[in-house]
Regions:
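Glycine/tyrosine- and acidic-biased, solvent-exposed loop/turn segments at the edges of beta-strands
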Residues: 1-44, 51-185
Length: 185
């Protein structure tokens, strides 16, 4: 029990969090692996021949170890070994990738997803692990709404609308218990 820290083979911080009674409990974080490399030469590029070096050979070795601050990869809370509350995942550049909400290890609440450019690509809601209510997807390049549909107890239900990437309506369909009823457009 207590704080546990794990590290990558290069000794960079990998995870940190708390255990209570042998299970994860409280805030946990996972970090991206830090990059360390060797430079053979004066140009700062690994494995290249440098014109300023003697006889154009790899005759010097430098170890470059940047002063990294660990970059978050994933962060959230555990309660009795289960994910609980908001969990956020990040791209390596620090931008948000996902925000997922949990209760006792099950999706519960709004789930949001972004692409590497920062555009939201999907948003959906869950209640007790089942998709419930509105689900919206967006075009990755523009962030313009692409599709919208509804779910009840994890099954597609009601109107489904799809748009072109210029925002114009493409088609609409109606679903009952996950089955398409008819094409409206």
């Amino acid at each position: 029990d207590g704080v546990v820290i794990t590290k990558y083979p290069n000794n960079g911080l990998k995870t940190e969090g708390n255990y209570v009674n042998g299970v994860r409990n409280g805030e946990w974080a996972e970090y991206w692996e830090e990059v360390w490399w060797y430079d053979y030469g004066e140009d700062g590029e690994a494995n290249t021949r440098d014109t300023l070096e003697n006889n154009n050979r790899w005759d010097s070795v430098e170890v470059i170890i940047p002063n990294f601050k660990p970059k978050l990869k994933t962060q959230g809370n555990y309660l009795n070994g289960n994910r609980d509350g908001t969990w956020t995942e990040y791209f390596e550049d620090g931008k948000r990738k996902t925000e997922l909400n949990y209760t006792s290890g099950k999706f519960n609440g709004l789930q949001s997803y972004w692409n590497p450019n920062g555009n939201k690509i999907e948003e959906k809601n869950y209640i007790d692990g089942k998709q419930q209510g509105l689900r919206t997807t967006y075009f990755e390049e523009t962030g313009i709404k692409k599709e919208e549909t509804y779910f009840k107890d994890g099954v597609q239900q009601g109107l489904w609308v799809e748009w072109f990437n210029d925002g114009q309506n493409k088609r609409e369909r109606f679903f009952t218990d996950g089955e398409r009823d008819l094409s409206l457009i």
